[in-house]
Design a protein with these regions (language model features):
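N-terminal helix-rich module
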Residues: 2, 26-42, 46-48, 52-56, ...
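N-terminal single-pass transmembrane signal-anchor helix
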Residues: 1-31
Length: 180
């Protein structure tokens, strides 16, 4: 009685493993780049969304709404890299006080470095939707530079124009490349 056996020979198995290892070696680094790109774009979108929320709430409520960097997602701090807070700034001092309504707080932003340019630790949207930085009515444009572990080559910028509208860009306001 002849029994036919099904399966792979050792040579077929070794060839399959070799092809698989080549594909993994080529594919994993590009997957890592895709993952880093997605983290950066996601954080950019969250920050732009927070700016759009602040601007629209300032117009709708006819009040000043402030965004500030935050270390604990509850109070204003010295860094934007740990997160930020969006709040209705009733007294216009640029700080979250006990009676002010927090509209959004963001933390854990995927290990990115966020550096504000032109508006320091906080900026405010006025009831007309225009931006004001550091309580200076003339400071009405600015940018954020967002960097990850890949450095300046992959940095992105959020540019806020004089009307207060934020947009993501590969370049600074003046057209130069961002620096991390």
């Amino acid at each position: 009685m002849n029994i036919k056996q099904n399966g792979f020979t050792l040579a077929e198995l070794l060839v399959t493993l070799a092809v698989f290892s080549i594909l993994v070696t080529v594919g994993v680094p590009s997957f890592n780049q895709t993952l880093l790109n997605n983290r950066q774009v996601s954080s950019l979108n969250i920050l732009v969304g927070s700016m759009q929320l602040a601007r629209s709430e300032a117009i709708v409520q006819n009040r000043r709404v402030t965004l500030c960097g935050s270390d604990d997602s509850q109070t204003c701090g010295n860094s934007w890299s740990n997160g930020w807070v969006v709040f209705v700034d009733g007294n216009g001092d640029g700080q979250v006080n006990g009676t002010e309504v927090v509209l959004r707080s963001v933390n854990d932003i995927s290990r990115l470095g966020i550096t504000p340019g032109g508006f320091g630790n906080n900026f405010m949207y006025r009831p007309n939707g225009r931006m004001m930085a550091n309580n200076n009515i003339r400071a009405n444009t600015g940018q954020f530079t967002v960097c990850d572990i890949r450095g300046a080559e992959h940095a992105r910028t959020i540019v806020v124009d004089s009307s207060g509208r934020p947009r993501a860009s590969k370049y600074n306001i003046d057209g130069t490349a961002p620096v991390c």
